[in-house]
């Protein structure tokens, strides 16, 4: 598990491009036959990717978390971004097609990832946060998630938001998780920008062609920077940072948050004239 410490906005505004990427961009989450994880000290969030092949992959704490098992003090949200697979939780099987979500609560000991077809394996993305109470394990197919339409073609941000884990959906301690799909010929997300100083956020960009890129904007509103992001790469967004992007083509991204105020609408919008 890779370890990344929290950062100050005063320090970040002096970072080079390489340093920005080192601190905030997760370039490699998906390796066939392995689980890759990154621990960020922003709200103690763990970001991970798993591609099970012929053998299942077990989610364990390793040496880093200093617990007997991964979910001893945590909860986790999982979304499959690839072909059909399943997750087995303490003996119970949960099938996930592409874009389906599974929430697993505090205290579940044995969690493993499986692909239905090892020649065309599932690609599981997960985000974990600290937990203080056990909520039930629940799967939510994308067909059962309530879509919210936002934006317009004129603004190049016509998109659909699916909220999976939130106060009016799958219940959790603090984790919030969902997905945004942009329509063809629409490239902007989260503009006008916002911040939520009580919660960090992580974006995973996917459904992109190999030669497509997203220019992800970050930093304080008056001190913005950008990261150039490829398919299936994640961005760690500190609580003090905006998180917005524009692509060379349309894309999909998964957003996940942890921290205080378990409310999707708890955010402070930034006026366009205040962005620099």
Swiss-Prot record:
Zn(2+) binds at residues 194, 196, 201, 243. It holds the Pfam family KduI. PANTHER family: 4-DEOXY-L-THREO-5-HEXOSULOSE-URONATE KETOL-ISOMERASE. It catalyses: 5-dehydro-4-deoxy-D-glucuronate = 3-deoxy-D-glycero-2,5-hexodiulosonate. The keyword Transport does not apply. SUPFAM superfamilies: RmlC-like cupins. It comes from Halalkalibacterium halodurans (strain ATCC BAA-125 / DSM 18197 / FERM 7344 / JCM 9153 / C-125). NCBIfam families: PRK00924.1. This is 4-deoxy-L-threo-5-hexosulose-uronate ketol-isomerase.
